[in-house]
Design a protein with these regions (language model features):
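Second-shell residues forming the walls of enzyme active-site clefts
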Residues: 53, 73, 104-110, 114, ...
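Conserved, mostly hydrophobic/aromatic
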Residues: 53, 89, 172, 201, ...
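Hydrophobic core
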Residues: 13-21, 391, 914-916, 923, ...
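Preference for extracellular/luminal or secreted protein segments
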Residues: 29-83, 184, 399-800, 805-807, ...
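Short acidic, glycine-rich surface-loop motifs adjacent to enzyme active sites
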Residues: 81-104, 225, 237, 241, ...
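Hydrophobic faces of well-ordered beta-strands that scaffold small-molecule active sites
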Residues: 59-66, 87-91, 167-175, 223-227, ...
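Short, aromatic- and glycine-rich surface loops/edge beta-strands on solvent-exposed regions
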Residues: 834-846
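N-terminal hydrophobic targeting/anchoring segments and the immediately downstream early-domain regions
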Residues: 29-185, 513-516, 644, 939-940
Length: 1009
């Protein structure tokens, strides 16, 4: 009988231990698992691979940069394409592949057609891959040559010998002109990514991507190195690693949203004929060096990278459940490839003393990144990785800090073994000499051929990468590898009409007021200029040079703003501007206030140096020069400034290494007296974070335009004259303005969060009504959309808490926080018992939300939604356009319950914390009881453990009653919060143990008598 009771008690304990955690009302948060789709054209790619020669296989791994535009049969590039079977080329204006001009689109289309035709030509008799003297080749390791091998089945796949494999023809086209857009004439002058980010509308990124995809595909471009997915969480004005306007912004969520939208646009515009390669994986946002010059080292762990740098790449590697035959889930904005950057990390795997090699060259770091679930699924679906240019100075200095040698074979092999599928051989030599780089390219390809023949592991790695490459090319050409499919219509390319209206619309939405506030602007800068007022425009006069022999041109023409102002508001328009009272000068003219300039100005469109062009014989200067010793200052700038009513400075980036920018900053610092009692406006046509707080204080107004495209110059003038409002908002943090992106993207404290429940009335129908709700039913709650302080939906991952209040019992349960997605948080709660419950949502610092009142009675139930009046929290006014406040009905907000005020809001009667604490408390109580019984009572071992088990069971029974909301438990919850479960369970356990001891003692006494 005793053993029976012991077994029964043990069963009860086990049962309640399993059931107890289920008593807590845990939210249902399910995530649908999307199966990884098979890469499109995978089987066709495998069949082609089986029929390819060694030379064909190896050559496909390489994209090269080349010099000139000579593609005749005897040219260097023809030799590389026909005899070395290279897989692709990267076009650059700096390498004289084409000359920008009105006919550039047609000339580029002709060039790509001729390059693809070269790929269709048969090679000269192939040079057999011979091993180096130190390698022994066995017959079984020799791959069949394409000219002599017969197509044999491999793994059940019939081999197909390809006669033509289209070339990858790649391009950088980031927007905002040179140097990061190769084609600067004949196409739509797209803005910078930062300008698009300032609109906070991903739709604009999709529009820009669609325009770019449509135009580039008509030129025969099939690989786009972009968009830039780096996150500028902390701007670095003037630092070598400063990204300037090349990024979408500083918030990982929004960079990902814009990046995915841009990818969708390119895919749609090109009809899926362009492979989009996001860069610079895993992110250069924290870099303090220019990667092309020196490999940066960033002190971040992999976990830290996942929070910021990697988040946008996760957003563009989302694979849909059912991709089409021509794209890898393009509807999700998934990129086709990732450009792997040369960046190192300290503490990558947690050890702060250990540093990785550059990720592009480090197999361990590369595989750790590719093994992340978000990236692994994309890779499994056919995602291709491209190395960044392997010949840049930063890579050379990594191997030889003195930059005196360059081992081309080693660099290429280590980049390939690290995991890159495609090797980009850009600047592939110690100097800028094209003959030297050409020799390195040929030697490297021959070295890879030898390794393929002699090393089975290496050969398997080549086949794996080549399968991805072939599948991607098949996708671009819908499985049709015929020379005709790779040709484009040259006449159609010549007739491309720029989409200027679309760019103008983006410009209108991006112009941002930085200082003062929108409320104070009319008082200090009246847009109603009188005809008798004088205006002086002073423009940064840096020049851009696209190649060493190209004629330089100004980034912003000196009279550009003046011409726009006269066109819009001159005598032939509104008559607000008198041509005789408008004058234009340059930053160099400001030397008249400081003395002559003796430095040589470096022409840069941004703070990052221009890429190095190739030379056929001579070393070419990598940065163009605009002036030597400065010419005498324009005679009249002092008089013009003295007589001016409005002075407008047109800025690019203010890199102090550029003399023109230094002159402007010196002018603000040393001659602020010349600006006294004048309206002074600065327009930032580059990144807007270069001025410090003191410099900004000397300005009447400060606007950001982010781009020097003509549409943005016009939009800035329209805002200046009051014709259009500054509709944009800063996408990056600026310390000088006390503008924190983290604060601005947090929930607006003055909003009322919409809250709905499934199948209930909406706020517009907020009247009580009968509803069939019963105890045990579930309610699907939905809070949102939740907006940030700029009026946009909050980033994904913003925590939201649903609060269940029981007015009668004066108890409140705060559920575990859930994260938003697209500005909305969802949770399922269970109606636990009869009575009244009020449900609301909190997203700190936003406290006000709709209130859902649920009343469950014996015969009927009711539910209603009430919209309370928000309680504004005093916050500093942001420096951007004000956020429209949501309207609210005049219903007083619910008062806090006593339980909430005394406990700060309990987590609930059956929270996970309470369960864990109860579990350990009961274990400790049972152990203590067992030890105490052994020490103080003469009870045998069996009876002793029986008492412990009964006390343990009693504790769990009380816990279940507490979690289920048994009558009277509310008082315990109000007094102890989530500690109540443990307190009550331990008390019950001790009480049962004490009673058992008393009973056992009486039995012992009776036995003694």
């Amino acid at each position: 009988m005793r053993s029976y009771l012991v077994r029964w008690a043990s069963l009860v304990v086990a049962l309640v231990t399993v059931i107890a955690p289920l008593a807590a009302p845990v939210p249902a948060q399910g995530q649908s698992l999307v199966p990884v789709p098979q890469p499109p054209y995978l089987e066709q790619a495998k069949a082609m691979l089986a029929g390819m020669s060694v030379n064909q296989k190896v050559g496909q791994l390489f994209i090269i940069s080349f010099a000139g535009s000579d593609v005749l049969p005897g040219s260097d590039i023809a030799d590389l394409i026909i005899n070395y079977r290279i897989g692709g080329l990267q076009l650059k204006a700096a390498n004289y592949n084409f000359v920008n001009g009105p006919d550039a689109p047609a000339r580029i289309a002709e060039l790509t057609n001729r390059l693809q035709l070269l790929a269709a030509q048969s090679p000269m008799p192939e040079i057999e891959a011979s091993p180096t003297p130190t390698i022994t080749v066995t017959p079984t390791q020799t791959a069949p040559d394409r000219r002599t091998a017969t197509a044999t089945p491999t793994n059940g796949i019939a081999a197909v010998t390809p006669t033509f494999i289209p070339l990858f023809i790649a391009l950088n086209q980031e927007g905002d002109g040179a140097p990061y857009s190769e084609i600067t004439q004949g196409l739509t002058p797209l803005p910078s990514q930062l300008a698009i980010g300032a609109t906070w509308r991903p739709e604009n990124a999709e529009i820009a991507g669609q325009i770019l995809g449509s135009e580039l595909s008509r030129l025969g471009i099939n690989v786009l190195f972009g968009p830039v997915l780096d996150v500028m969480d902390t701007p670095k004005p003037g630092a070598p690693g400063d990204a300037g306007v090349r990024v979408f912004g500083g918030d990982p969520y929004w960079v990902g949203k814009f990046g995915a939208a841009f990818v969708r646009g390119v895919h749609a515009g090109s009809d899926n004929r362009i492979a989009v390669v996001g860069k610079h994986f895993p992110g250069l946002g924290s870099s303090d060096r220019n990667v092309d010059d020196e490999i940066p080292t960033v002190q971040k762990s992999l976990e830290q990278l996942k929070q910021i740098e990697l988040a946008p790449f996760f957003a563009v590697t989302q694979i849909g459940a059912q991709p089409s035959a021509t794209t890898v889930a393009s509807d999700t904005g998934a990129v086709d490839g990732l450009l792997v950057s040369h960046i190192r990390y300290r503490g990558f795997q947690g050890n702060i003393r250990a540093s990785t090699r550059p990720v592009s060259l480090d197999p361990l770091a590369y595989q750790a990144l590719m093994s992340l679930p978000e990236i692994a699924a994309w890779r499994a679906a056919g995602g291709v990785t491209f190395s960044d240019a392997l010949g840049v100075r930063g890579v050379r200095r990594f191997y030889d800090p003195l930059d005196l040698s360059f081992n081309a074979r080693r660099v290429a092999q280590e980049a390939f073994v690290a995991g890159n599928d495609v090797l980009v051989l850009g600047s592939f030599g110690l100097s800028n000499s094209w003959p030297e780089q050409l020799a390195n390219i040929k030697d490297t390809i021959q070295f890879f051929r030898e390794r393929y023949v002699s090393d089975q592991t290496f050969a398997a790695r080549v086949d794996m990468a080549l399968t991805r490459i072939l599948a991607l090319k098949l996708k671009l050409y819908q499985g049709d590898f015929s020379p005709e499919t790779a040709q484009v219509d040259v006449a159609g390319a010549a007739e491309i009409s720029p989409s200027n209206d679309a760019v103008a619309a983006i410009a209108k939405e991006s112009i941002t007021l930085l200082s003062p506030s929108a409320r104070d602007l009319p008082a200090v800068l009246s847009p109603l200029l009188r005809k008798d007022e004088s205006i002086v425009f002073i423009t940064d006069d840096r020049e851009v040079k696209e190649c060493s022999r190209c004629a330089p041109y100004p980034a912003i023409p000196r009279t550009a703003l003046q011409d726009i102002a006269l066109t819009l508001y001159g005598p032939r328009a509104t008559g607000q501007v008198d041509p005789a009272r408008v004058s234009s000068f340059t930053f160099s003219d400001l030397a008249n206030f400081h003395g002559p300039v003796t430095e040589t100005a470096t022409a840069e469109a941004t703070a990052t140096p221009l890429p190095t062009p190739l030379s056929t014989s001579l070393t070419i200067t990598d940065t163009p020069s605009i002036t030597g010793t400065a010419e005498p200052a324009s005679p009249g700038i002092q008089e013009a400034i003295a007589q001016a009513d409005l002075i407008v400075f047109a800025m690019l980036d203010l890199n102090t290494q550029t003399p023109s920018a230094a002159l402007f900053r010196d002018f603000l610092a040393q001659r602020a007296d010349a600006l006294r009692e004048k309206r002074v406006v600065a327009l930032a046509f580059g990144a807007p974070y270069y001025l410090d707080a003191t410099e900004i204080s000397k300005l009447t107004a400060y606007f950001a335009a982010y781009s020097r495209a003509s549409a943005f110059l016009e939009a800035a003038i329209r805002v200046l004259f009051g014709e259009a409002p500054p509709a944009g908002a800063l996408p990056v943090s600026i310390t000088a303005l006390n503008y924190s992106l983290l604060v601005q993207t947090s929930p607006d404290p003055n909003q009322v969060i919409p809250l709905t429940a499934a199948n209930v009335v909406t706020p517009s129908q907020a009247t009580p009504g009968p509803l069939e709700l019963k105890v045990g039913n579930s309610l699907q709650l939905r809070a949102g959309p939740i907006y940030d302080r700029n009026g946009h939906v909050v980033p994904d991952g913003t925590p939201v808490q649903f609060v269940l209040a029981y007015p009668v019992e004066r108890v409140e349960q705060q559920q575990a926080p859930v994260s938003t997605r697209d500005g909305v948080a969802e949770m399922t709660v269970v109606i636990e018992r009869k009575g009244q419950v009020e449900i609301r949502a909190i997203a700190e610092p936003a406290q006000a939300s709709y209130v859902i009142k649920v009343n469950i009675g014996d015969d009927a139930s009711s539910i209603e939604t009430i919209r309370p009046t928000p309680m504004p929290t005093p916050t500093p006014e942001p420096t951007v356009a004000p956020t429209p406040e949501p309207t609210a009905t005049p219903t007083p907000p619910p008062e806090a319950t006593d339980a909430e005020s005394s406990n700060g809001g309990a987590l609930g009667r059956a929270s996970p914390q309470g369960f864990v604490l109860t579990l350990f408390a009961l274990l400790a109580t049972g152990l203590a009881a067992a030890l105490a019984l052994a020490a103080v009572t003469p009870i045998d071992l069996t009876r002793r453990w029986r008492l412990v088990l009964w006390s343990w069971s009693a504790g769990w029974v009380v816990y279940v009653l507490y979690a289920a909301g048994a009558p009277g438990m509310e008082r315990i919850a109000a007094a102890f919060g989530w500690l109540g479960a443990a307190v009550l369970s331990v008390t019950a356990s001790v009480a049962v143990l004490a009673l058992a001891l008393v009973f056992a003692g009486r039995q012992g006494a009776q036995s003694a008598t």
